[in-house]
């Protein structure tokens, strides 16, 4: 009982202001993708190109998110998490304003790539600082609660983006993103602690390569990092492709498109709330196992229904909603186990995880796009199911050792 009260106090006093400031920046970068995706139909019209460029915007954004992961984590280990994170918030604001100067889809896509680099700061720097600051059960609760706030972006983003382009030019969205990032900068400047453990060490590229080689040789880490990527791929593929699937493919309105996102991301939030409630009461491996059933089952429902009837978009939404609940329940624990499967400094480990995940997302979204172009909704959801089955196989291998995630920390 005393331990639980102590955890509650720590969660309330130590883990409030900094995570809220970080999640505001995270929200700005996420809504920078989720809100603009429905607006991409207006963007391609502005530049006079076809709709195949719609998911490419998200591909470029996520590719940027992979670009500097390898460097930012180790740099923050040595010069400090705080200055690197503050630089990231300012960088995102500048690139959001710079995109207003583009005059072709190629320039727009390049700026989306540069904006995407801002994602590198979240996992490799911000989340690493949080993981270093708190014990396991408290950290998982913080991560789950932060995820709920961050998930407002994909929940409200499609609705807000669809409404925005009916009322205002799409360019105004990027001014909003820049303003949110600047507000996050002010909060982080005041509240972010310093948790780096290797400050003052010289950054050597050969030593950096050696560090990454040690991390990647760890089979448990590699399996967990791949699993984290495949877990979220169906959700990100849906975010990227759903404007085309719903509005162009099914002929529905932008309002209908936005409303179909609500059950999916609402269930994702519910999964995170369930995780926050169960964390500390159940071993981490048990939480992952509980999430596996709805994850794979939901993807199977979406695939079978759309292979049987190509326009069964309501069944597809129901299946993806069930999957989203599962990922909300399982993913934070899997992330934690993977991060601490290596003894290397957490900036380096987190950066390696981020690069692997972003590579899977970048490649997977393009594969998902072509699956839909070639085979419609059925092929798209079959691709998502394959991703879920790969996740299941990797997690089964990772949890084969009964000692992994088998303790309950309060």
UniProtKB/Swiss-Prot annotation:
Keywords: Antibiotic resistance, Cell inner membrane, Cell membrane, Membrane, Transmembrane, Transmembrane helix, Transport. It is a multi-pass membrane protein. GO terms for cellular component: plasma membrane. It is found in: Cell inner membrane. The chain crosses the membrane at residues 16-36, 53-73, 85-105, 110-130, 145-165, 167-187, 227-247, 256-276, 287-307, 314-334, 347-367, 379-399. GO terms for biological process: response to antibiotic; xenobiotic detoxification by transmembrane export across the plasma membrane. Residues 1-15, 74-84, 131-144, 188-226, 277-286, 335-346, 400-410 are cytoplasmic. It comes from the Bacteria. GO terms for molecular function: sodium:proton antiporter activity. InterPro entries: MFS (IPR011701), MFS_dom (IPR020846), MFS_trans_sf (IPR036259), Sugar_transporter_CS (IPR005829). Residues 37-52, 106-109, 166, 248-255, 308-313, 368-378 are periplasmic. Monomer. Belongs to the major facilitator superfamily. MdfA family. Efflux pump driven by the proton motive force. Confers resistance to a broad spectrum of chemically unrelated drugs. This is Multidrug transporter MdfA. It comes from Edwardsiella piscicida.
């Amino acid at each position: 009982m005393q331990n639980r009260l102590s955890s509650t106090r720590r969660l309330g006093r130590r883990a409030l202001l900094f995570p809220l400031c970080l999640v505001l920046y995270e929200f700005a970068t996420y809504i920078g993708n989720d809100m603009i995706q429905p607006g991409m139909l207006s963007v391609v019209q502005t530049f006079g190109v076809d709709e195949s460029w719609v998911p490419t915007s998200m591909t470029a954004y996520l590719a940027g998110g992979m670009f500097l992961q390898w460097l930012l984590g180790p740099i923050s280990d040595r010069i400090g998490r705080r200055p690197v994170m503050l630089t990231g918030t300012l960088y995102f604001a500048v690139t959001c304003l710079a995109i207003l100067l583009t005059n072709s889809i190629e320039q727009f896509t390049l700026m989306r790539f540069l904006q995407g680099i801002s994602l590198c700061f979240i996992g490799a720097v911000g989340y690493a600082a949080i993981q270093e600051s708190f014990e396991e059960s408290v950290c998982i609760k913080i991560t789950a609660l932060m995820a709920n706030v961050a998930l407002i972006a994909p929940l409200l983003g499609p609705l807000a983006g669809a409404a925005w382009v009916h009322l205002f030019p799409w360019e105004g969205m990027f001014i909003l993103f820049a303003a949110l990032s600047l507000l996050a900068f002010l909060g982080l400047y005041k509240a972010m602690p310093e948790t780096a453990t290797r400050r003052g060490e010289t950054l050597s590229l050969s030593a950096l390569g050696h560090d990454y080689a040690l991390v990647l040789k760890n089979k448990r880490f590699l399996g967990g990092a791949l699993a984290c990527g495949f877990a979220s791929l169906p959700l990100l593929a849906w975010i990227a492709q759903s404007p085309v699937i719903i509005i162009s493919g099914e002929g529905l309105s932008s309002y209908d498109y936005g409303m179909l996102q609500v059950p999916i991301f609402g269930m994702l939030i519910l999964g995170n709330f369930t995780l926050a409630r169960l964390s500390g009461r159940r071993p981490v491996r048990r939480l992952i196992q509980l999430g596996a059933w709805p994850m794979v089952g939901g993807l199977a429902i979406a695939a079978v229904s759309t292979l049987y009837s190509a326009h069964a978009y309501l069944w597809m939404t129901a299946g993806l909603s069930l999957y989203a609940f599962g990922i909300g329940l399982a993913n934070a624990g899997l992330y934690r186990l993977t991060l601490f499967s290596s003894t290397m400094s957490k900036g380096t480990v987190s950066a390696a995880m981020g690069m692997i995940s972003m590579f899977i997302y970048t490649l997977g979204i393009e594969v998902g796009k072509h699956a839909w172009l070639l085979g419609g909704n059925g092929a798209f959801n079959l691709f998502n199911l394959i991703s879920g089955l790969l996740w299941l196989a990797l997690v089964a291998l990772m949890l084969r050792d009964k000692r992994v995630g088998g303790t309950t920390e309060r």
